[in-house]
Amino acid sequence: MASDFIPVTLIYDTGADFLYLDEDYLKLNHLQNAFGRKGKATMGGAGNGEPERIDIFIDPITVHCGAREYQNEITPIIKLRDLLGCYTDGLLGNTHLLMNPLEINFSESYLRQLKGPLLAEQLDNYVKLDARFEDNRIDVKATLQIDDENSLEGWFRMDLGCGSTIILTNETASAFNFMDVPKAYFCTQAGGIGGGSEEVTIRAAKFCMADTLENLVIDYSLNEKGALSSDRPYIGIIGNEIWSLYDIVLDPVSSSVWVKRNENQGTYAQSSVTHMATVDRTDICGGWIVNGLYKGGVAEQAGIEIGDIIVAINNRPVKEITWEEQRKGLELQGETTYTVQKPDGQIVSYTLFIGKQII
């Protein structure tokens, strides 16, 4: 909850600093002026655009999270739902949540701030990663093998605000010969704070961190600006498709990251079968906005474009599809009809033959 006990749904983002609130969440709940004075700031992020001028709240906001209370000094207002959908109201970063050791339990879906480090016997089944805590961020060392000719070892940024597996920076990918590696080109309208993004999806033979994952789907960035471009202190980022396989303890005092494999089998070896990415924006429109497309995929070939609004799938309005269903996956197969609203308001139906992974 934020000040005055207004409920909010926040994502813990290890790639962020403090509290960030979504612009549409504030507008739809008539909270644009609920938290005091405003100012302006310039902010960049993972997107491929220039840093943007955004509104910020310059008066402190008190955040109640469980039994904890945080005083947030400056709160940026960002277009977060364009990226993550209508069930997210904001982000909470490391400044507040990493004041003490933090337990992140994906098995039972909870975060818990600890009063002190866990005892050695409590960490018996955990693996300690090679980690560093610098500039309010967390990096871990890992090894990635693309194929027999391409492998790398180095620091990867821990990014719990990213829903992907691994994304290599543009600079990292440029050092390798991916000419003979099967690939799929992906472009998004909103690829992170700072605008859209361009990526290439490939398969990697192995990823070694706490244990070894095989045949995983990863991306490398083509962005020339932002957090995935070049001149970064890491070779890529690791997102929740990987981290959700583990229960985690973060200890900022000793700069330690401990992980324990859980029972989640994950979807890291599966690539897109619809060949597009959508964002549920039923808070502001009639459906899901197409945010990204794979070049030459079944969605693009059918005529779907970035910015289209999907209003129904197989004649079922997407407004009826719950968040729980979306998270589990719709398991669409074969001939599938998408009813789409184009930017000019025209309603068009497209038939996609769903089944083949993009890579």
Task: Tell where the protein language model's regions lie, with residue ranges.
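Pepsin/retropepsin-fold aspartyl endopeptidases
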Residues: M1-I359
